[in-house]
């Protein structure tokens, strides 16, 4: 958990950003991709007052896919991961933990703005971030999703989006032209079209040379 230097004396309350795949958030030596996202440098350079909560994923074999998968993958998709079991399905329990255990703990122990939470993630971490954003729009009012693996649960997200009340919330979304699976671009474009009719405070960026 990162807190502003003066949080104990300033008497301010701060917005909170939940960071999935949290081992990538701060330090290169902790990142499983070898390079951190540089959140510490960013908040200091931009002079942003925010509490950052970086949550490590379970990086055992297929556990990240289970933990960040809101629904159970179908058999064909599960087999792409080289297993005969069905993958995913623990994401709802994870998001329930965020909303019913982690958020109350943060609000009780840190000077949070209790109605100003955001959530961010990439790839599978983006899937679970977007799921939380749609499932609990009164809690997670801001969301950033990068290189989202929408093709895994494309139909499920389209259906959830139809019944989610996110019209007053904020969303950032991007995808690269050099992702490691050709399904990233069309599935992100499809969800982009569905999202555009749901909220106005929304940015979508396509980076032609962007890699996963």
PLM region spans:
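Non-catalytic cap/lid and distal C-terminal segments of serine-dependent acyl enzymes
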Residues: 2-212
């Amino acid at each position: 958990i990162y807190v502003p230097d003066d949080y104990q004396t300033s008497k301010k309350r701060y917005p909170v950003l939940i960071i999935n795949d949290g081992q990538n958030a701060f330090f290169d030596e902790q990142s499983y991709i070898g390079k951190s996202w540089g959140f510490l440098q960013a908040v200091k350079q931009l002079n942003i007052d925010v509490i950052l909560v970086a949550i490590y994923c379970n990086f055992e074999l297929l556990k990240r896919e289970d933990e960040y998968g809101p629904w159970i993958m179908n058999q064909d998709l599960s087999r792409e991961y080289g297993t005969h079991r069905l993958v995913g399905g623990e994401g709802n329990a994870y998001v329930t933990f965020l909303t019913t255990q982690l958020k109350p703990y943060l609000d009780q122990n840190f000077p949070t703005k209790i109605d100003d939470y955001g959530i961010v993630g990439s790839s599978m971490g983006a899937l679970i971030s977007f799921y939380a954003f749609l499932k609990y729009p009164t809690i997670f009012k801001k969301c950033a999703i990068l290189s989202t693996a929408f093709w895994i649960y494309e139909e499920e997200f389209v259906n959830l989006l139809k019944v989610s009340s996110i019209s007053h919330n904020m969303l950032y979304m991007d995808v690269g032209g050099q992702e490691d699976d050709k399904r990233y671009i069309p599935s992100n474009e499809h969800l982009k079209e569905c999202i555009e009719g749901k909220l106005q405070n929304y940015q979508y960026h396509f980076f032609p040379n962007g890699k996963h």
